Amino acid sequence: MARVKRGVIARKRHKKILKLAKGYYGARSRVFRVAKQAVIKAGQYAYRDRRQKKRQFRALWIARINAGARVNGLSYSRFIAGLKKASIEIDRKVLAELAVNEKAVFAAIVEKAKATLA
């Protein structure tokens, strides 16, 4: 049986990993064994952080809405309760955008929520 030479396949595999590791510091971008570990770890971080990004943005939106609501004399939880009671369905992303950039519009929404609670 003939000997199988894997030079072409190995080079292709190495080039693929080293291409993914381009821009990494030191041996992480040059040495195959280290680069492979770095690429695997980077993939794990990317997977984890795609999920964390959703949580972090929601927390940011809530913080911005809370700040805007408190300026208008209402806490976040009371504001959200008022919106639910008034059946105003605006998501937190849009509310946060309004609280930061459209203060007058946000104040009007807070007043509606306040009126519903009273």
From Swiss-Prot:
Database matches in SUPFAM superfamilies: Ribosomal protein L20 (SSF74731)
Pfam families: Ribosomal_L20
Keywords associated with the record: Ribonucleoprotein, Ribosomal protein, RNA-binding, rRNA-binding
Keyword Lipid biosynthesis: no
GO molecular function ontology, one term from the record: rRNA binding
Family: Belongs to the bacterial ribosomal protein bL20 family.
Gene Ontology biological process terms from the UniProt entry: ribosomal large subunit assembly; translation
Cellular component terms (Gene Ontology): ribonucleoprotein complex; ribosome
TM region positions: none
Function comment: Binds directly to 23S ribosomal RNA and is necessary for the in vitro assembly process of the 50S ribosomal subunit. It is not involved in the protein synthesizing functions of that subunit.
Highest rank taxon of the organism: Bacteria
Protein name: Large ribosomal subunit protein bL20
InterPro entries for this protein: Ribosomal_bL20, RIBOSOMAL_L20_CS, Ribosomal_protein_bL20_C
